[in-house]
Amino acid sequence: MNMLLLFLHEVINGERVTLTACSECVCPLQTSSSDDEYKCYCADTYSDCPGFCKKCKAEFGKYICLDLISPNDCVKPVSSSEAKQKMIKGERVTLTACSECVCPLRTSSSDEEYKCYCTDTYSDCPGFCKKCKAEFGKYICLDLISPNDCVKPVSSLEAKQNMIKEERVTLTACSECVCPLRTSSSDEEYKCYCTDTYSDCPGFCKTCKAEFGKYICLDLISPNDCVKPVSSWEARQKIKLLQGRE
């Protein structure tokens, strides 16, 4: 069994490896004596040769490699799509963070767990997350239904439109913003209730714009209009009240 097959075998049989796009590092190779420096196999082929991690750890919104297979075992570059398909064909895979996952439904007592519809444009077929977890301000998929259960690929835009039509609240890549209400002819603009836990007081977005798979606030009501910080759960309740009035 070559090292790639061994790697996939280990992943399938217990150790979960997060495979992400280049910006978050797919599989890093250690390139110096410093534990912080890696040569990363990027989804968009920025590196010459991929490496394979036995274990990956999320830290400050990025993924770092904890255990490396020797770079000498690297045979040839593999695209992100190929790598993901190999992982998916094996069994469960953790796909991506928020930019490719729509998390609208609260499914447990935890505010951080949702049913998620995955909209990963890098894979042939999106699939469906059983559970999604907020980690370092992003949402990651914890468990995927088999790709065989996927009928047809759905684009991120289609998925979002479906969520909006069903009047569900979509929590975006920006975990601090809830964007449920379409407010213009543009599919990318929404009324957003900001729940930024890093600021003293949330505030309210007049419009929100999708940019590079994340949502950014275009226009804020004065912070003076904000009375006190509210939790993500409270924000969603306020959104429901607003929806009921319109």
From Swiss-Prot:
Keyword flag Ribonucleoprotein: no
Propeptide span(s): 31-35, 77-95, 107-111, 153-171, 183-187, 229-246
Residues forming coiled coils: none
A Gene Ontology molecular function term of the record: serine-type endopeptidase inhibitor activity
Gene Ontology CC terms: extracellular region
Record InterPro entries: Bowman-Birk_prot_inh, Bromein_sf, Prot_inh_BBI, Prot_inhib_I67_bromein
Disulfide bonds: 22-42, 25-74, 27-40, 49-56, 53-65, 98-118, 101-150, 103-116, 125-132, 129-141, 174-194, 177-226, 179-192, 201-208, 205-217
CDD domains: BBI (cd00023)
Keywords recorded for this protein, A-Z: Disulfide bond, Protease inhibitor, Repeat, Signal
Leader peptide range in chain numbering: 1-19
Domain of life: Eukaryota
SMART domains in the cross-refs: BowB (SM00269)
The protein's role, per its UniProt record: Weak inhibitor of cysteine proteinases.
Family to which the UniProt record says this protein belongs: Belongs to the protease inhibitor I67 family.
Subunit relationships: Each inhibitor is composed of two chains, designated A and B linked by three disulfide bonds.
Protein name in UniProt: Bromelain inhibitor
UniProt source species: Ananas comosus
